[in-house]
A protein has these predicted regions:
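Secondary-structure boundary/capping motif
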Residues: 79-82, 111-112, 145
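Acceptor/aglycone-binding surface of glycosyltransferases and processive sugar-polymer synthases
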Residues: 1-3, 13-96, 123-133, 138
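DNA-recognition element of transcription regulators
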Residues: 100
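Charged, amphipathic alpha-helical interaction segments
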Residues: 38, 108-111, 143
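C-terminal, non-catalytic tails of nucleotide-sugar-dependent glycosyltransferases
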Residues: 140-151
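Catalytic donor-sugar/metal-binding loop of nucleotide-sugar-dependent glycosyltransferases
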Residues: 67, 90-94, 103-120
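The conserved acidic donor/metal-binding loop of glycosyltransferases
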Residues: 6-10
Length: 151
């Protein structure tokens, strides 16, 4: 298993065993720590940031026709075989949208993706790297992603 999480401790390392357990319990190939499933929560985000993130995930779900509530989540447990089967050199996105592309790639390769609720805490130090270029990459990129070929 390979884990991904934010380096600023917005994700609670104590939740790592829950991600691992959920992969095993639900026979999931990918387990996503989700802010937007029942029981999930975001702590200390302004309402505008919350709604922007929530509706961005809704947009992705509708455009890509995937059933993941938190498409930009960065707290993930992958089975090793998932990452070995995805050509990481062929990932198009460099901003936050790579989170979307990785989940979509896993689904297109036939892997089972499961979400579990987490409590996401906004960073206490530093600033978000979100900017208009990253937003544009995600917004337009999701439309382009529909036509990407997956082997």
């Amino acid at each position: 298993f390979i884990f991904e999480m934010d380096a600023d401790f917005s994700h609670d390392p104590d939740d790592l065993p829950r991600l691992l357990y959920s992969c095993a319990k639900h026979n999931a190939d990918v387990c996503v720590g989700s802010r937007y499933v029942p029981g999930g929560k975001i702590i200390n985000w302004p309402k505008t940031r919350y709604w922007l993130s929530y509706y961005a995930s809704l947009y992705v779900r509708l455009v890509l026709k995937i059933d993941i509530k938190d498409t930009t989540a960065g707290f993930i447990c992958y089975k090793r075989k998932v990452l070995e089967s995805i050509d990481l050199n062929n990932i198009w996105f460099v901003g936050y949208a790579f989170q979307i592309e990785m989940k979509y790639s896993a689904i297109k390769h036939g892997y089972n993706v499961k979400e579990i609720p987490i409590h996401f805490k906004d960073r206490e130090l530093g600033q978000s790297k979100m900017n208009i270029k990253i937003f544009r990459e995600a917004f337009i990129g999701v439309l382009k992603l529909r036509s990407k070929k997956f082997d």
